[in-house]
Structure formats: C-alpha cells, structure tokens
Amino acid sequence: MSHPSTVTSEPSNLLDFVPKLGNFVLNSSLHGNNSNGYSSFSSNSVHFGGLATQNRYKFVNSLSFSKEGSNLKRILSDFNRVIRLHCDRIPLGFSSIGLNSGESNGVSDNGHGVLEDVRVPVNAVEPESPKRVLILMSDTGGGHRASAEAIKAAFNEEFGDDYQVFVTDLWSEHTPWPFNQLPRSYNFLVKHGPLWKMMYYGTSPRVIHQSNFAATSVFIAREVARGLMKYQPDIIISVHPLMQHVPLRILRGRGLLEKIVFTTVVTDLSTCHPTWFHKLVTRCYCPSNEVAKRATKAGLQPSQIKVYGLPVRPSFVRSVRPKNELRKELGMDEHLPAVLLMGGGEGMGPIEATARALGNALYDANLGEPTGQLLVICGRNKKLAGKLSSIDWKIPVQVKGFVTKIEECMGACDCIITKAGPGTIAEAMIRGLPIILNDYIAGQEAGNVPYVIENGIGKYLKSPKEIAKTVSQWFGPKANELQIMSQNALKHARPDAVFKIVHDLDELVRQKIFVRQYSCAA
C-alpha cells in the first residue's frame, strides 16, 4: 500500500498560481495603461507584503474597475497566502520528508532514532565517537571550495580524529535537474556581466529571494533532506549564500535545530548578497566589520555574529621561509624584486597583455638589465601557459600552471596583480603583499575594491600599461609606498581566522552535547 505524498495543498496552491500569473501576463496589457489611464504596474507600487502608501490608491483604483484587475488582485492574494505558508511556518511536506512506504530516513517524528547509514543517535551523540561536520558549498567561483577546504584542514590540524569533516556541493549532488546545474549557470552568467548584474541585484529584495526559496523548496526538499541526513552531522557549515534557507527550513521542520549546530561562514569581504543571512543560524562568522553590519541589518542578534576574518588554508599561518630560498626553489632570480600575476584557477583576465607590459616596464634599456621579475600563475589555462612560455622575455619570467602551494608563490614576491576575489585578497594580506586589482565580478566583489583602496593595501587599475608603470615605480622611486602598503596589509590580515572559527564551533557542539546529556539525566 503506497502512502500519499505529504506535500499536499500548499504546493498545489503555488503551482496553481504560476500558470495563473503567466496567463494573466500574456493575456492582459500589464505594461500599458488601463481604462483609467494609470499603469497597472510601476517600479515601486507593488509590494507583496502590502502596497506602498504613496501609490496604493492609484493602483487599487486602476484594478477595481476591470476584470483583469480583479483577477490580478485575486492572484496576488493567493501568492501572499502561499508565501506566508512557506516563509512564516514550516510546510507540511517538511515535517515528514515525503518518503514512500518502502523508504525510511531512520528518524521518527519525535526526533529519536538513528539514521540508517551510520546508526548513530541523533539526540545523544556519544562523546567518544567522532563528531561529524558537513560543509555545504558550491563551485560557483573558486572561493567557496577554498574556504571549505581551509575549514576542513583546520579541523584536522586542531582536533585530529575527534571530527569527521565532509564537503558537499549541495546543489550539484543533492538536487534534481535543473537545480543541479547551478555551477554551470553561474559560470555562464558571470561571463555575461549585464545578465549577472540583473540576477544579483534583482534577487536582493527579501520578498523576491524568500519567495524564490519557498517555490524552489517544493521541488527539492526531499532530495536535499536526504543529502543532509545521510551524513548525520553534528555541525553544518554553509560557505555559500544559497545554502542557508532551504536546509534550515528542513531542519526546523524535522525538529533538529536544537540538535544540530548550523552556522554560516561568509566568504565575501565587504559587499555580500542578502541571502547570506538567516535568523535561525546558531552563528554567522563575518570576515569584516562591514559584513557584520549587514548581518545586523538583516536581523541577526549580536550573540549570533562573530568577526574573525576570512578562513584561509592553515599553511598561510606557518612561518614564512626566506624570499631568496623560495625564489631559488621556484626557479626565480634570488635578488630581483618580483611581482605575482594571477588569473584565478581558470587563468582568466588580461594576463597576457599585462605580462607583456610588465616585461617592457621592468627592463631598463639604458642599463641593459631588468629592474624586476615576473611570476605568472595561469591556473588550468594550458594554452595561455604555453603561449607565455614561448615568449623571448627581456626580464626573468616564470610561468606556472595550476599550483597547490600558492603561499610559497606569494612568499617569493613583493606585490600581486589579481582580480578582486576575497580569498586571494585575504591571503595576500597575510603575506604582506600590496595588491593591484585589475578586475572584479559585479555584486559580490564590487565592495572588495574600496576595501583594498581605503585600507591603504593597494590600487585598482584596469590598463595593463598603467599596472606595469605602477609596479615599475614600486620597484624603483616609489619603494617607500610599496613598504607602507605592505605594512597596512599585515595590519589588516587575520591569519588565525580559520582556527578561531573551528574552536568556536567545537565549543558550540560541546554545549549542545552537554545540554542533551543533562536533559537525558534529568
């Protein structure tokens, strides 16, 4: 005997709403004027939580005398009701994840029992058993995975076998098509700037992204729940802005928020999307005071917010080997000042043009000798690496592909040229490298540019010739400016951020265990 789906009237309301709205838009002149001469939709007149006071009367009057207006008001009313069901309380489908008769998730409705994969009690984790950490990320850019791997490495270094750490791409691995195409969609959007800007800023208002998550949850809740539960986590860490809302709704629906520590590690230094913040998190780790202010504005309490810095791989905390030793190991000149040119993991950006400009600017024709040298990281772009390697340079140039010990490359150089990725900026500051930013992704990276400039850490320059000229001056008459920026970078660096995060997480999970054991004893 098969069990009917637990997702009943609520999803059907939402699914009924979508075609209604679509048909209405297609069959009505929403963008034109109605019989009263008023535009039915204006940029600031419709708020799903209520109409703006200034424009409410025009909007209501324009709709009240037509069949289309009546239909639209009814549809908006249905939409508001559905969104309240999804945003103000837990949908029925999340209280029981909708398993068929032959399936079992191992957890009874009262929260007791074990999950079938690991047979470890949910609400009575034994102190002797390894605690489990699940890190949620997505390969939309390299920074999220880098932060996830940094946290995993820090857990291993600090606690050894006390913790088992798992990293999963929640959307790619635990959602159905088309939701599992998120990384591919992101890569397409960021290559088409206007599309990405429209997507980023268009989903920033709370009413938009809350309704998006509510609608999306209907289709992915079952798969995401299975993906979360199979790891039996004591701690869930989100390092991605799209990993808070749906998982938290599922955990709340299962009554697991009191048993599992759910935290967010924001990986944007300044500008960040509002979806990073959710009031139900145990902790939100912010990389800067700017981000902490955004978290407070989003409604998080001071006790939920910690400003520790951006987590970077633990290898950056270790003592730096002498520059000449690192340069010798990398095949560089041991005495000439060096600039590091990076294009990210995919070797994107105007790397070739910038490298050629540096090759000319760092050569003194009068003396017939170089005034500096260049280290280029091409990432996975083998074609670019081959092309740069074939050039007959007038200065010492080392071309590398994808490197795993970027801390050694940074330690061998005196300044860096890169796009405004937060992870690279944080790592460069730890190594005391003045930064020249040559590009950024609209939205999340836009705030990193003023962050670098206003803190006296570097400059933003687009032109390869201007970049080369600045580096040449830093290695010559403006060496003092380079030194000041290096000191500022070290002053703003937070090399121990990842260790502070994992120790705070350890304390949080121990508090949970103590409370559960005390409750059982009582």
From Swiss-Prot:
EC nos: 2.4.1.46
Effect of K419A: Total loss of activity
Site positions per UniProt: Substrate specificity for galactose: P422
SUPFAM superfamilies in the cross-refs: UDP-Glycosyltransferase/glycogen phosphorylase
Lineage: superkingdom: Eukaryota
Keyword presence, Kinase: no
Activity regulation info: Inhibited by ortho-phenanthroline and UDP (competitive inhibitor relatively to UDP-Gal only) and inactivated by citraconic anhydride, tert-butoxycarbonyl-L-methionine hydrosuccinimidyl ester (SLR) and N-ethylmaleimide (NEM).
Record's catalysed reaction(s): a 1,2-diacyl-sn-glycerol + UDP-alpha-D-galactose = a 1,2-diacyl-3-O-(beta-D-galactosyl)-sn-glycerol + UDP + H(+)
Keyword Chloroplast in annotation: yes
GO molecular function, a single term: 1,2-diacylglycerol 3-beta-galactosyltransferase activity
Outcome reported for the amino acid change (mutating H245A): 90% reduction of activity
GO cellular component: chloroplast inner membrane
One Pfam family, short name: Glyco_tran_28_C
GO BP term, example: glycolipid biosynthetic process
Keywords: Chloroplast, Glycosyltransferase, Membrane, Plastid, Plastid inner membrane, Transferase, Transit peptide
Localization (cell): Plastid, Chloroplast inner membrane
Assembly mode: Homodimer.
Protein name: Monogalactosyldiacylglycerol synthase, chloroplastic
Natural source organism: Spinacia oleracea (Spinach)
